[in-house]
């Protein structure tokens, strides 16, 4: 069992039940899934960029990624409907907890001048999104083998009903918030 999953079941659930006064442990918010997305506008001109992005995302998450396609055509961007413009991975269960553990304890501390993640990334329903400017912070990516620095978006979807509950859950899991 993943370390964070064990921590969640043994320590976080009782703590959050006490803090928010839940009458049932099923009311305690939990992480449902983590979506890692890499949007690549440059893939319109150069399709090879997309191949390396798919490979890097698979190394970071440990799961094969899905290529995302444009929903509609936009002439000013020279974009046609159905063109590949990015890739994404949805993580659940064990892989989700292992990825979150690596993100919090290994990857985020490797960011230059890291003071913590912003507390403003909540959407009003307890889900948290953060952007990472370069994929190099993950130890799985080798500096010599990358052709271009690419950023990625990470969305942590929780069952929390409010931002306050979601932030309390992520803080207990070890997410380093700035404020």
Curated annotation (Swiss-Prot):
Annotated Gene Ontology cellular component terms: ribonucleoprotein complex; ribosome
GO molecular function, one term: rRNA binding
Domain of life: Bacteria
InterPro entries documented for this protein: Ribosomal_uL5, Ribosomal_uL5_bac-type, Ribosomal_uL5_C, Ribosomal_uL5_CS, Ribosomal_uL5_dom_sf, Ribosomal_uL5_N
GO BP annotations, alphabetical order: translation
Pfam entry (one): Ribosomal_L5_C
Keyword list, A-Z: Ribonucleoprotein, Ribosomal protein, RNA-binding, rRNA-binding, tRNA-binding
Keyword Magnesium: no
Alphabetical list of NCBIfam families matching this protein: PRK00010.1
Role description: This is one of the proteins that bind and probably mediate the attachment of the 5S RNA into the large ribosomal subunit, where it forms part of the central protuberance. In the 70S ribosome it contacts protein S13 of the 30S subunit (bridge B1b), connecting the 2 subunits; this bridge is implicated in subunit movement. Contacts the P site tRNA; the 5S rRNA and some of its associated proteins might help stabilize positioning of ribosome-bound tRNAs.
Family stated for the protein in its record: Belongs to the universal ribosomal protein uL5 family.
Oligomeric and partner information: Part of the 50S ribosomal subunit; part of the 5S rRNA/L5/L18/L25 subcomplex. Contacts the 5S rRNA and the P site tRNA. Forms a bridge to the 30S subunit in the 70S ribosome.
Protein known as: Large ribosomal subunit protein uL5
Gene field: rplE
């Amino acid at each position: 069992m993943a370390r964070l999953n064990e921590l969640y079941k043994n320590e976080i659930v009782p703590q959050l039940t006490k803090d928010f006064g839940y009458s049932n442990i099923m009311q305690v918010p939990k992480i449902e899934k983590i979506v890692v997305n890499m949007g690549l506008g440059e893939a319109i001109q150069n399709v090879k960029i997309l191949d390396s992005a798919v490979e890097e995302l698979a190394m970071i998450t440990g799961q094969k990624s899905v290529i995302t396609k444009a929903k509609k055509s936009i002439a000013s961007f020279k974009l046609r409907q159905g063109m590949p413009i990015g890739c994404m991975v949805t993580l659940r269960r064990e892989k989700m907890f292992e990825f979150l553990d690596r993100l919090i304890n290994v990857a985020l501390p490797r960011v230059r001048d890291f003071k913590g993640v912003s507390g403003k990334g909540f959407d009003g329903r307890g889900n948290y999104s953060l952007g990472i400017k370069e994929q190099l912070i993950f130890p799985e990516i080798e500096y010599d083998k990358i052709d271009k620095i690419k950023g990625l978006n990470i969305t942590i979807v929780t069952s929390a009903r409010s931002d306050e509950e979601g932030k309390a859950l992520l803080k207990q899991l070890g997410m380093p918030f700035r404020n």
